[in-house]
Amino acid sequence: MRLSRYFLPVLKENPSEAQIVSHRYMLRAGMIKQQAAGIYSWLPLGFKVLKRIEQIVHEEQIRAGHIPLLMPTLQPADLWRESGRYDDYGEEMLRITDRHKRDMLYGPTNEEMITDIFRSHVSSYKDLPLTLYHIQWKFRDEIRPRFGVMRGREFLMKDGYNFDLDYESAIHAYNRHMVSYLRTYERMGLQAIPMRAASGPIGGDNTHEFLVLASTGESEVFYDAAITDLKFGDRVVNYDDRAECEAIVKEWTAPYARTDETHDEAVFGQIPEERRRSSRGIEVGQIFYFGTKYSEPMGATVVTADGSRVPVHMGSHGIGVSRLLGAIIEASHDDKGIIWPEGVTPFHAGIVNLKQGDSSTDLACEALYRDLSARGLEPLYDDRDERAGAKFATMDLIGLPWRITVGPRGISAGKVELTNRRTGESEEMSSGAAVDRLAQIYAGI
């Protein structure tokens, strides 16, 4: 993409309404525009990152054997009355009446609807286990929406639901989701720690939240520092192997890690003092096992091998897709702007032409643009007639992991400059070597 043809409405000054870094940089980098309290339009740069994150989520869900579908944003209130949650949910739920005077709601979650889909089409234990998921916009009428996409009223979320014949199978689904989430977050350049948490209005007696450590987090967290040394890495997982999934879950849940709602000071005190940590965290996902909480009242049952009919065991599993943008920025930025991890960057590298209009630099930039594209990479070429300082400031603000700088002096020596946004380190090399280096880096992402 050529920046001269791109829609990137960057702001020079910090917006007064932005209280935290991620909100400030998302507005300044032209990623979002507020349309109402807690409701945003996603502008091209922000939308591009959103789709990168969504793609990683899809890939890891499918890798784990989960099946995508799409449910509507509007739901009939009668489904929620069946489960007993329609009146319990409170004012966060946006209730709507259509022209036929039917009660509807803008879904904050989908347990009732997915249960209705299941009971309409599945009746035998032979069709289990089954896990369905979707990525869809949700709405919760927060009383005080703030912090940009971190606590908005409308948000994009992946929510998945497992249906299993018995407790043991449902716990395997729980473990499978935890393993899948660990891989998902690490691919995004995040360390998201699974922490024992409270279930809230969704219910159930087994739940973990995934939290990214950040000073702006809404939750107080307590943990053993040993957990921050764990890496998922490139291990290959057989998601059908119960023992393998259980072992990974034990590895990640053995060190103490809890939110303030479930914190146990006595247990925490048994950890060596030098490893005890308290901090704040941003919730980016949560997994639940809630047994027959929804299947029993809503009649989601299957016939077993002996002919008896039993309610299925269920769980739900969510990832805050739009919230992840804010969490990534909170965890990865400096005083110049965003620093995107390679896995979610909107463009793989920026090309800066130091002397637009000079035939040698123009030709070199065009060749770089063409060669990077031919290797399957997406460059952002700053071909504007702007001073070099303004171009560097824009690149630093939007946070592309790599920048290639092209100028007349370097071209005369057959060199370009490749700069790492995170470290600030620069290296001169040929254009071909720069293309090869970037292709190698992204081949491993």
Curated annotation (Swiss-Prot):
GO CC annotation, single: cytosol
Question: What's one GO BP annotation on this UniProt entry?
Answer: prolyl-tRNA aminoacylation
Q: Which Gene3D superfamilies match?
A: Anticodon-binding domain, Bira Bifunctional Protein, Domain 2
Q: Where is the signal peptide?
A: none
InterPro entries attached here?
A: aa-tRNA-synt_IIb, aa-tRNA-synth_II, aa-tRNA-synth_II/BPL/LPL, Anticodon-bd, Anticodon-bd_dom_sf, Pro-tRNA-ligase_IIa, Pro-tRNA_synthetase, Prolyl-tRNA_ligase_IIa_type2
UniProt EC number: 6.1.1.15
Major location (coarse): cytoplasm
Compartment list: Cytoplasm
Kindly state which reaction or reactions the protein catalyses. tRNA(Pro) + L-proline + ATP = L-prolyl-tRNA(Pro) + AMP + diphosphate
Keyword annotations from UniProtKB, A to Z? Aminoacyl-tRNA synthetase, ATP-binding, Cytoplasm, Ligase, Nucleotide-binding, Protein biosynthesis
Q: What quaternary arrangement does the UniProt entry report?
A: Homodimer.
Q: What does this protein do?
A: Catalyzes the attachment of proline to tRNA(Pro) in a two-step reaction: proline is first activated by ATP to form Pro-AMP and then transferred to the acceptor end of tRNA(Pro).
Sorted alphabetically, which HAMAP family does this protein's record hold? Pro_tRNA_synth_type2
Recorded protein name is Proline--tRNA ligase
Q: Which organism is it from?
A: Cereibacter sphaeroides (strain ATCC 17029 / ATH 2.4.9) (Rhodobacter sphaeroides)
Identify the coding gene.
proS
